[in-house]
Design a protein with these regions (language model features):
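Conserved active-site/ligand-binding neighborhood in enzyme cores
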Residues: 1-223
Length: 223
């Protein structure tokens, strides 16, 4: 499966769901002169491509560490008190390191065993990895100062609005699969267009800037 990496170079949106990402790509395609209405009309019966939301990745030790959302798993029957505490901790996990995800999705690791041995895993900022030395995404939320006028006193008042984050050791990626390969060059062109312009609601102020790279990733899929 194709992976598209967005490495932020300025304040970047904290989350980028698939519908927002698809809309941004369609905007880029439209600005480049492609038939977006014709593209969208194919989706009920014959989708040209599908894509995921963005997920975090970390660059460390000469490799890219992908993190993926927790797969949907059957409810766990927790009986031991220590497992109950671990299950509560696990509920706060949003992303799994790709190695853990593959083991869970492939059936090599049972959820019950993961919960029972949760103390052997590293959990930081909602990201779970098998080893404590595995880095997690280092990001700091950014507060943007604004001014507003008090209508009663006509005085200027400062307030702060949290927007996105600054990332130091990675970025975000999303997965995309083309069923109609004729659309791959246009989508790549639209992504390059977005790379030049930026993404998100604050691009005019220099936010949402990123560099773009393409790659491949093997994901365990259901038969």
């Amino acid at each position: 499966m194709r992976a598209v990496y967005l490495t932020p170079s300025s304040t970047f949106p904290t989350e980028f769901p698939s519908n927002t990402l698809f809309g941004a790509i369609c905007t880029g395609l439209s600005d480049l002169g492609y038939d977006v209405d014709g593209l969208i009309s194919r989706y009920p019966e014959d989708p040209p491509f599908i894509l995921s939301s963005t997920f975090p990745y970390v660059t460390a030790g000469g490799r890219i560490h992908h993190f993926l959302p927790c797969p949907l798993l059957p409810p766990l029957d927790v009986r031991r008190e220590e497992d109950f505490d671990n299950a509560k901790r696990f509920k706060r996990v949003r992303y799994l390191h790709e190695d853990v995800f593959r083991d869970l999705a492939g059936g090599d690791l049972r959820l019950a065993d993961l919960i029972a041995g949760l103390g052997d895993y590293a959990i930081d900022r909602g990201m779970l990895a098998r080893e404590s030395k595995t880095p997690v995404l280092e990001r700091d939320e950014v507060e943007i100062p604004h001014n507003r006028i008090n209508r009663l006193s006509s005085e200027s008042e400062a307030f702060y609005h949290t927007y996105g984050s600054m990332i130091r050791n990675g970025g975000y990626y999303f997965l995309i699969r083309f069923y109609d390969t004729a659309w791959e060059p246009p989508v790549r062109a639209a992504l390059r267009f977005l790379e030049d312009r930026g993404v998100g609601p604050k691009t005019s102020g220099g936010q949402g800037q990123f560099s773009l790279t393409f790659g491949d990733i093997a994901i365990q899929e259901r038969p």
